[in-house]
A protein has these predicted regions:
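N-terminal type II signal-anchor transmembrane helix
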Residues: 2-33
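Exposed boundary/loop context
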Residues: 4, 13-16, 43, 51, ...
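Mixed-charge, polar/low-complexity N-terminal
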Residues: 5, 100, 192-194, 198-200, ...
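Internal mixed beta-strand/loop scaffold within catalytic domains of large alpha/beta enzymes
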Residues: 142-239, 389-391
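A periodicity- and composition-biased signal for non-globular, repetitive helical segments
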Residues: 12-13, 176, 349
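C-terminus-biased signal that marks the final domain/tail of proteins
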Residues: 23-150, 244-449
Length: 449
């Protein structure tokens, strides 16, 4: 009997070791081969008005390697700031760092089947160029699946603007005091076989948060906490990137958002300056609702319908999606929430008041006035008609809405500086001196959960 029990114990211990080894291998998946890349053969970098701009071109691995080469210090800073956020989670909610890493590793593996291989290869190139831990880069790519954020976005055109130009404003309101803004860059992509685009974001993250492609399509997103969520799906940053890379118009954007496996609650505003037109997409893990300008489907009493305008904060207009939400006072009406009163209604009221008189400067004022205080990490205004972007990032703990907006012209941005036509007149930068008053932050830093 003693010998039997000993064998049983050894067998059980062996099984545990096998399971542990299998678990470790599952959480640390393999990768593709390293490649020899000359980053300067296709890629390059420049500084525009104090912002690092990296130009990435070629295969996924090449573009990742180019990003890592030209923005190495900022990539390392992104990873360091991300590590700091995990340390902060331990201090604020008692979540040990190893547990936070484990949660992110599991999340990545659950999302992995839905993440295109080209993005995995790009992350590998980024890690190889910088010496960063690939596992940390992977963790950063799924942070949107387990954190919350409050943002806002609007698209206006036609009768709403002075000359029909389509303006698209986007406030990215998240964690301001983690220092992520110190790693801000503009990435200009020319991926093989896909649509070129420009993305305002952070050096160590290959996903997209804000940007516009050369087909005049601008993307934006708003966090909308829901009970209908899943860890299995395509993370937000890659949904937005696929929109820019794959979608030349709104029909394709709608097809994409309906076909991907979504994870948690997000609202999107996507515009096409060629049309001009825009759509709002309200999504949960299992639902997608699509709305256009002045949409008769917006029957909820708190909806603000305006011709030639699409805008969103957290609250959904679709009754089913709204019934699943856990934000903006859900399941009650959103009145009194900062999301509704300051962001959604704030946009709608200002567009109505200035209807037909909105130019770039006025659109920027609407953007700044509806930003959140102490959480406005970056803010972007695009002129989708003329392929222009204005981008501001937070600085020294101060909101992006209070900073200088840097202008980019996508008609010439993809050219090397020596190939660009000379500028014959000063660019119109819509940056009024007096900062607009914004709302206080709603809640504290979202924990990793």
């Amino acid at each position: 009997m003693r010998r039997f029990l000993k064998r049983l114990f050894l067998g059980f211990a062996g099984l545990l070791l096998i399971l542990a080894a299998g678990g470790w291998l599952w959480l640390h998946p393999g990768r593709g081969p390293r490649e020899d890349v000359d980053p300067a053969a296709k890629g390059w970098s420049e500084e525009v008005d104090g912002t690092l701009v990296v130009h990435l071109k070629g295969t996924p691995y090449e573009m990742g390697y180019q990003r890592g080469h030209f923005a190495r210090e900022k990539v390392l800073l992104t990873v360091a700031r991300f590590e700091g956020m995990l340390d902060r989670a331990k201090k604020e909610v008692g979540l040990p760092k190893f547990a936070a890493n484990l949660i992110l590793d599991i999340t990545y593996q659950l999302c992995s089947p839905y993440i295109p291989d080209r993005y995995k290869r790009e992350m590998e190139g980024l890690a190889d160029a910088t010496g960063c831990d690939l596992q940390m880069i992977r963790r950063g790519s799924v942070i949107s699946v387990i954190t919350e954020r409050g943002c806002s976005a609007f698209a206006i055109w036609g009768g709403a603007t002075t000359d029909g130009t389509l303006y698209h404003g986007r406030n990215f309101d998240w964690i301001l005091d983690a220092g992520l803004e110190d790693s801000a860059i503009l990435a200009v992509y020319e991926p093989e076989g896909l649509i070129p685009f420009a993305s305002a974001g952070y050096a160590g993250m290959i996903g997209v948060l804000s940007g516009m492609n050369r087909e005049h399509v601008t993307i934006s997103q708003i966090g909308a906490v829901t009970s209908d969520r899943s860890l299995r799906g395509l993370p937000l940053e890659f949904v937005l990137r696929r929109m820019l890379e794959e979608c030349p118009d709104l029909d394709e954007a709608t097809r994409l958002i309906k076909s991907v496996k979504n994870t948690v609650g997000f609202n999107y505003v996507v515009s096409d300056g060629k049309a001009p037109d825009a759509r709002a997409y309200e999504t949960t893990a299992n639902h997608v609702a699509v709305f256009g300008p002045d949409d008769p489907k917006e029957t909820v009493e708190y909806a603000i319908r305006i011709p030639d305008a699409v805008f969103r904060a957290d609250e959904a207009m679709d009754p089913t999606v709204r019934s699943l939400q856990r934000c903006a006072k859900a399941p009650d009406l959103p009145y009194g929430s900062i999301s509704y009163d300051h962001r959604y209604k704030g946009i709608g009221t200002r567009v109505k008041e200035q209807y037909g008189k909105i130019d770039a400067a006025a659109a920027l004022e609407i953007l700044k006035a509806t930003a959140m205080v102490d959480t406005n990490l970056h803010a972007v205004l695009t002129d989708g008609t003329n392929l222009k972007m204005w981008v501001a990032h937070a600085k020294n703990g101060q909101d992006a809405s209070k900073q200088h907006f840097v202008e980019y012209d996508l008609k010439t941005l993809f050219l090397r500086p020596e190939d660009r036509p000379p500028v014959t007149a000063p660019a119109q930068v819509p940056a009024p001196e007096a900062p607009a008053e914004a709302a206080p932050a709603e809640g504290h830093t979202p924990p990793v959960s």
